Amino acid sequence: MKITWLGTAAIRLEADGETVLFDPFVQLVGGENPNCLDDFLQDQTICVTHGHLDHLMEVPEFLDPESDAEATVYCGEVAAETLSDMVENTSNVVKVRPGDVIRLGDVRILVMEGKHAKPGKSQVFQKLFSRKFLQYFRNALALAYLNPKFPEGGQTLMYEVHAEGKRVQVMGSLGLQEDQEYPQGADLLILPFQGSEFLEAVALEVVERLQPKRILLDHFDDAFPPVSEHVDTRRFKKLMDEEYPQIK
């Protein structure tokens, strides 16, 4: 099994002869991990966790009949509705909901209910009145225009991949439903480390509930300035070593 982080929440998982791409996104001007659409277009199976632009905006390119991509896209109903407003042919868009199982050869992907993180008001104000906001003002205008077109709509999914005798949990945002029971002990949890004013505390709550064997952090990079920012992960690593030394 091979897992590659491609910036933001984009993850490519290769196992049992299958390749699955989660949440592809091309970073904006000034992004910390510059990439391009060609980095993704060879992928044939796309899983989307939710409808926000940094998870869904590039997906129409995979559905363009004039491109070389002929991908199948799995996503929730809200994200599917967004795609239907953007492309003429959505025959390759498969709506999924919690409890569904996606089967790709010997790979099995369980769809689970997630929850989107809630940024604090102080975080928003800090970004609006920062020098960075002026530096990337064109990005800010583009994001202000695009953001309403990509609603999350209260629907964030989480995926658990079963392949090669391993379980990998892929979260698209740092949140779990309070009344939901989740499988524990995954071989790897891909944890988006962004989006909360109390980031370490919220992440530790997720770890406590899921009890993974290993963790891979993503989404902590500055992908769409001035709205995003680079998040220092060292404090979280220190807390993990203290509270969960068995988790690597």
Residue ranges, per PLM feature:
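Active-site environment of divalent metal-dependent phosphoester hydrolases
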Residues: V29, H52-M57, A80-L83, D100-I102, ...
